[in-house]
């Protein structure tokens, strides 16, 4: 059964390629190499989407989470197919920085140091979407990071925390979602946990984040 459905998905992809010349913006195919991983990714997404043909019987109407998930799978399949078509020159490959900028749209990205900000800006994220924390979001977190910190130093940290929270709230007047990006060191993990508690933030913490390429960053922000 799975094999039959896999072949059905493959036929859908092949049919879309046959009809390319009818669509505005497509070019004649040039020589290329099939990205088998992307092709399989597209077929698996279409196979998953096919489930909704059966679960939505007899009307095929979808709403709410089902509609969102069905469309998400089709978009994921489309992106994988577009990647393959770009490899064969049928589509012009979109500038990764434009896709990254679009993925970051509406997001406040909190980072723990300026090197991560520089990485994201270089990749295409708008600088105004990024906030370098430079401090935790709670005095308790500072104590956990440095249990021996003197009380006199904590008073200065409290001021930084107050300014940081004010900056976040000000930026959230124009941005909707909060995302903490960085490496999974202790201070960033605590920052991510506190941001989730205070602002419902998501987090994307990865080792060796400085080594990420444009496609990795796009996936990180999506």
UniProtKB/Swiss-Prot annotation:
It holds the Pfam family DUF2100. It comes from the Archaea. InterPro entries: MJ1481_archaea. This is Uncharacterized protein MTH_1195. It comes from Methanothermobacter thermautotrophicus (strain ATCC 29096 / DSM 1053 / JCM 10044 / NBRC 100330 / Delta H).
